[in-house]
Every structure is written in structure tokens, then in C-alpha cells.
Amino acid sequence: MTTFEQFPVWRGFNLQNLYVWKRSDKPFDEKDFQTISEWGFNYIRFPMDYRIICGGTDWNIIDEKAMERLDQGIEYGGKYNIHICINLHRAPGYNVNVPEPTNLWTDKEPQEAFARLWGIFAERYKDIPNIRLSFNLVNEPPDISEEVYAAVMKKAVDAIREKNPDRLIIADGRHNGNSPSGLIRRLGIAQAMRGYYPSTVSHYKAEWVKGAMDFGPPEWPLLSDTAHSGKEYLWENSYKLWEDGINSHNVHVGEWGAHNKTPHDIVLRWMEDNLEIFKEHKLGWAIWNFNGSFGIVDSGRPDVQYENINGYMTDRKMLELLQKYLKY
């Protein structure tokens, strides 16, 4: 049985077909699921923009064509033995990158819309078992209090459980996915952390991140006159905060990876230190992209010799590094 107390170790990617309204909304490609499965991975997260699901900014409308595309993605997951996690990356009243006109954390209307959307998903997919499907409520909430966060998430949890009492539910950590919450855990749901530390490596020259264009040249391990910091530094400064949840096996790494402006050799060294931690603590994970600037295909890295594998321009070194850590 797949529950928040028996959280499997899934490994895979985010697919962004429902990610940004009018920009990246497109049908899922069955070949992506087939290839991800053939390469040994078993998890895909769908970060979604509520405006795609609603066909715009009116929360009371559901775009049935968008829902059918979501149905198709979930069906592909089942066909290729891949667990699908659906996530509201942009929710009514909140987006980590671009502010919404209302506030999910303080305003009644977006809170009601948020819970209603999750109730709709719960009803529609109630017959799909947890081994195939989970719900990740909202992407990377801000640095709000535990009390506020838990109160808003409880509304969505209640809406889900009214329709689908046993659904596996995941909540991202506060402070952009970096801080665990005891109150969230009391709701009987799992939590997801991030693997982007330090951002000077993961988001070097990422134009959507404030200050990233001014980061100095990245290095890994971090070197100074007094320190040589690699895997132990990552654990102490990022993952150790999650130790209770890690030891209880009810957390995973919902996003991680590095943008294509960081030199490839540095990215691979940094990734392997992260992967060693994931292996030691039996953590599941998902790279932010499958195809894109963080991904293993079509990532646009100037210092990679890409190979055509299954019709994908593939970063073989990164692919093989990830595959090295698929068994634990």
C-alpha cells in the first residue's frame, strides 16, 4: 500500500506540458513516457498552471479539453509503469515567480477556488490507486508561518478526502520548498523538499531568479582558504533540516538540478554529491526538466557533446550519472 507513511522511492523528471498558460500548454507526447521508462525512471511530476485547467483566470470554469490532456498524461504513466504526481505550480492566488492579483494565504476567494480544484481532481481520479497517482498541492510556498500554511492546505486536503479519502497527498516545504512543517505532517500528508542548494551552482545566470545574473563563476566543491565543501556541506546546509522526515521515509525531493549556464563538469560533480545523499537516505527525486535547461535532453548546454538517443539530443554523461543511482 502506498501511503504517506510508506512513501516509495520514486526517481524521474518534471514534464512541463501544462506548465504555463499560452506558452507551454501542449499535449503530452507518449514517446517521452516510453523513453523515460526505458531509461529506468519511474516518476513524473506535472507542474500545472491553473489557468490552463480553467481555460483562463475564471476559477469557476473547467476546460474539459485541458482535463482530457491531463487524463492522457496520467494514462501514459499507467501504461509505462510511471507514477504521476500532479501539482498546481501556479495556483489561484499564488505563484512563486510572478505575483497573482489575489493572495492565497490571506484571501477567502482564492482559498475556496484552490480547494475546489483539488476536489475536482480527487473526484475525477478517485479510482486511480496511489501507486500510480499522487497530489502535490502547491509549488514552493513562501516564508509564511506554519499556522497559515497548514490552515490553507487543510482546506485542500479536506476537499480531496471528501471525494477520495486515501489519496496520497504531498505538500512542498515552506520558504520555496526548503523548510519542513510539523503542522503539515500532522495532516497525514507527505512533504517535498528542493535540491537547489547552493543557488550559485543550480541557478547561475537564471534570468528569472533575482540576483542570479550577478552570481560569481560557480565552483564545486566550494573552495576557500578555510573550507573544502562538498557532500557534507550539502547535508549540513540543506538536507539535515529535513532529517526527521527523511528518517520517517515520508519526504522526497520534488525538484532539483542545475541550469544550463553552469559549466557541465561542475554540474556533474555537484549532482553526484546530491545523488550520494539521496542514496544514503533512500530519497526519491525529480529533476526539474526532462527536456529543457535543467534536463538530460535538449538542454542547450554549450559545453556538451549531445548524442541522438531514441531521437532525443541527449546529454549521455548526465543520463548515465542518474542511471547509476537508480538502484537503492
What are these regions (language model features)?
Residues 1-25:
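Boundary/entry segment of secreted carbohydrate-active catalytic domains
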Residues 263-328:
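Aromatic-rich peripheral "rim/lid" segments of glycoside hydrolase catalytic domains that contact
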Residues 28-49, 242-245, 275-277, 281-286:
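Catalytic domains of carbohydrate-active enzymes, especially glycoside hydrolases
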Residues 48-62:
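Glycine-rich, proline-tolerant flexible connector loops at the mouths of alpha/beta enzymes
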Residues 106-232, 236-259, 280-283:
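Active-site region of glycoside hydrolase catalytic domains
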Residues 47-49, 88-93, 173-175, 286-295:
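Short, solvent-exposed turn/loop segments enriched in Gly/Ser/Thr/Pro and often Arg
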Residues 25-44, 59-90, 97-134, 152-163:
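An active-site-proximal structural segment forming one wall of the substrate-binding cleft
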